[in-house]
Structures are given as structure tokens and as C-alpha cells.
Amino acid sequence: MDDKTKNLIQNHIDTNEVCLFMKGTPDAPQCGFSMAVTNMLKILEVNFKGVNVLENEKLRQGIKEFSDWPTIPQLYIKKEFVGGCDIVKEMYENGELKKIIEDKGINFKK
């Protein structure tokens, strides 16, 4: 991954409390997995930045290398990689996602 791509990824993570690297946008997800994570965050009423990896091939490949995670979407909360769709879904269902958001002081629907 080139430095420009790495810096772009790091900037998104550093400047957004909750950042979702996804296919499509929060209002128009382009895959079911991105839609699922977006919906979970919307149900919790968490403000988040959706980064459309389909707009930039280097970004799409780079985020996988950056996180050492092979799939998209990828969720970051307060600069920490949380996981992809399956992990986020499991955390949402068992209450762990809500707890992390609360513990990190992020506003959401309680």
C-alpha cells in the first residue's frame, strides 16, 4: 500500500469517532453486509462516517492490508478496529457493541 492510501485511511480513522469502510454509502449501501452494519448503527442512532471503498480501488485493497482483515465492511470505533459484518452483528445481538459505544463516550440511543 502506498503512503497516500495509508494516510487517507488513517485520516478517516483519526477524524471520525465511528468510521465504517463500506461498499456504497450509508444512504445507499452496495452490498448486503455493508447494509447490515449500517442498519445496526442507524438503529443505535450512532453518528458515523461511511467511507465508500468502491470509489477508490487503492483504498478498497489498502483497507484490507491496513487492518489485516480480508473483507469489507470494516468498522472502527475511536481508532480501534472492531471487525467486519459477522463480528459486528454478533456484538450487536449480545449487547457488546452498545457497551463499547457507551464505554467510549459516543452519543447514541440508549
Regions found by a protein language model. Name each.
Residues M1-C19, K109-K110:
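N-terminal leader/targeting and pre-domain segments
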Residues D2-K6, N56-R60, N94:
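Structural motif corresponding to alpha-helix initiation and N-cap regions
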Residues Q10-N47:
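Local sequence-structure signature of Cys/Sec-based thiol-disulfide redox active-site neighborhoods
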Residues F21, Q74-I77:
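Acidic beta-strand-to-loop metal/phosphate-binding motif
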Residues N39, S67-D68:
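Short, hinge-like loop/turn segments at secondary-structure boundaries
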Residues I77-K109:
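Non-catalytic, surface beta->alpha helical segment in thiol-disulfide oxidoreductase systems
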